[in-house]
A protein has these predicted regions:
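Short Pro-Gly-centered beta-turn/loop motif in secreted/extracellular proteins
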Residues: 49, 100-103, 126-135
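A short, solvent-exposed loop/turn motif at the edges and junctions
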Residues: 59-64, 137-150
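Surface-exposed, low-complexity/disordered segments
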Residues: 159-289, 300-302, 353, 358-469
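N-terminal export/assembly leaders
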Residues: 2-83, 116-118
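Extended beta-strand-rich segments in extracellular/periplasmic secretory proteins, especially
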Residues: 277-328, 332-340, 375, 380
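Short, acidic Ser/Thr/Gly-rich low-complexity loop/linker segments typical of extracellular
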Residues: 113-124
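Short, acidic, small-residue-rich periplasmic hinge/interaction motif at the N-terminus
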Residues: 17, 21-24, 73-87, 91-95, ...
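Short, surface-exposed beta-strand/beta-hairpin micro-motifs centered on an aromatic residue
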Residues: 42, 122-129
Length: 469
């Protein structure tokens, strides 16, 4: 039942949709044969914008699929091998001009819009977009490469995009040494200018894979909603709501089932080093890290400073080493690559391994992460989080050793400012002790139809094809 907040009476669905469109600047796209505007529904509207309420209203007894893309609300029936007519699709591959092959982790976004995706490890991509976006600029950008722009086509299309390396001949002012400590203090001072001061609602795709000795043993995927508080609300926490998910069948069962790694959508939604202040100096300029200036780079036609960091002391707790890329003009952190130091890896078992068994001896060997932010108006918004953790596992009973490698990636495919009163209710929130694979049901062959996700590579496609049989 819908949570009514205003006077109740039955009115045509079309009237409620018109009210929502005016109140929240929404544009509805749907097939009139599927969604009947003359059907009667309660006129009671929520006091604040609520995606879940709108989805429940529009899905109706037919259980229609409802997808939000920016201000577009797309409603359709999930049928095998088809998409709603309101959605178009551009797919293809991004290649390096030097002939080295497909480019992974290329940022793909509609200029001036929140909608976006990314290439997979083979450089392949699919972007689904509303017809209302036809003719707008689709931008392909990657660190160290010249960006390319295309107009979004009127029909489903296939693109082959070739990105050229930057020939870096930067003006003298851009290559002069910059004091890294002063640079990091300027990053701290400009946080309020560079990152949202209001809460946001993010739509994200999350994939988690586990390999045992280079063979997939567990694959899980999900679309989630994330409530991200203001970057100035330091003590408020993110909330995650599960939308849809699937898991793939694997050729072998995971032999070591008694341990689970720290991860999942809940934890990766909180891996925001800018909002958490990780690796940054405090307001007085003090830091637990030593900063090293490493030159400049280019991304999306912007000059980026490269600043390395390493802990001043590495004797207790967990510390990282890595590199930040900072936008020269705005002083915003736009990319972070970091990993646990060797000493911290040796201390990390109790942190990384959430469930264990006395039968197994687990030893983490690497834990590395990547974060990226994308520009939106005058601010930067979290765009992508990727984590890789490898462990050596010794089965004491079988006297067998295995190498387990898990890769988790979260791609923010859409976002919008949220009303300050709107939060994901605790009853709907993904809990910290949830394990993603345990929350998913049977395989859904139509999972890809409505959402922007990172395309699976060839090995993963085989895993999911097994699930269709």
């Amino acid at each position: 039942m819908l949570p009514a907040q205003e006077k109740k009476e039955l009115v045509p669905l079309g009237a409620v949709m018109d009210s929502l469109a005016l109140r929240y600047d929404l544009d509805f796209a749907y097939d009139a044969a599927v969604l009947r505007r003359d059907s009667l529904v309660s006129s009671a509207l929520p006091k604040v914008f609520d995606k879940q309420w709108i989805s429940t209203l529009l899905s109706g007894p037919q259980n229609l699929e409802v997808v939000f893309m920016g201000q577009q609300v797309i409603v359709g029936r999930s049928t095998p091998g088809s998409r709603p007519s309101a959605l178009l699709e551009v797919s293809g591959r991004v290649l390096a001009a030097d002939g080295s092959g497909g480019l992974p982790m290329v940022n793909i976004g509609v200029e001036g819009r929140a909608l976006g995706t990314s290439t997979n490890d083979e450089g392949r991509f699919v972007l689904r977009y509303p017809r209302a976006y036809i003719g707008e600029a689709l931008v392909f950008s990657s660190l160290g490469f010249v960006s390319e722009r295309f107009s979004l086509p009127q029909n489903d299309s296939v693109l082959e995009v070739v990105l050229k390396n930057y020939s870096i001949h930067l003006p003298e002012v851009q290559v002069l040494y910059t004091d890294p400590d002063q640079l990091m203090r300027s990053v701290r001072r400009r946080l309020a200018q560079n990152y949202p001061s209001e809460p946001f609602l993010l739509t994200a795709f999350f994939r988690e894979t586990i390999r045992q000795d280079d063979e997939y043993v567990e694959v899980s995927e999900a679309v989630v909603d994330i409530y991200k508080p203001s970057y100035q609300a330091g003590f408020a926490s993110e909330r995650v709501r599960f939308v849809k998910g699937r898991k793939g069948a694997t050729a072998r069962d995971m032999e070591v089932v008694q341990f689970k790694l720290l991860g999942g959508p809940f934890h990766f939604a909180q891996v925001d080093v800018v909002r958490n202040g990780d690796f940054l100096p405090d307001e007085e300029g003090f830091s637990a890290y030593r900063y090293l200036y490493k030159g400049v780079d280019m991304d999306n036609d912007r000059v980026l400073y490269r600043v390395g960091f390493e802990p001043l002391h590495d004797e207790e707790g967990l510390f990282y080493r890595g590199e930040l890329r900072i936008d020269k003009e705005s002083r915003a952190v736009v990319r972070v690559d970091f990993e646990l130091t060797p000493a911290s890896i040796r201390r990390s078992r109790s942190y990384l391994v959430r469930r264990d068994s006395r039968r197994f001896r687990t030893r983490p060997v690497v834990a590395r992460y990547h974060l990226a932010y994308r520009p939106w108006g005058q601010h930067w918004v979290l765009s992508r989080v990727r984590g890789e953790v490898s462990l050596r596992v010794n089965d004491r009973d079988r006297r067998q050793r295995s190498l387990f490698a898990t890769v988790s990636e979260m791609l923010v495919s859409d976002f919008a400012p949220a009303d300050g009163q709107q939060r994901i209710p605790w009853s709907e929130a993904y809990r910290s002790d949830y394990v993603l694979s345990e929350q998913l049901g049977t395989f859904d062959p139509d999972f890809w139809q409505f959402y922007n996700v990172v395309e699976p590579d060839e090995d993963l496609r085989r895993v999911f094809q097994e699930g269709e049989r």
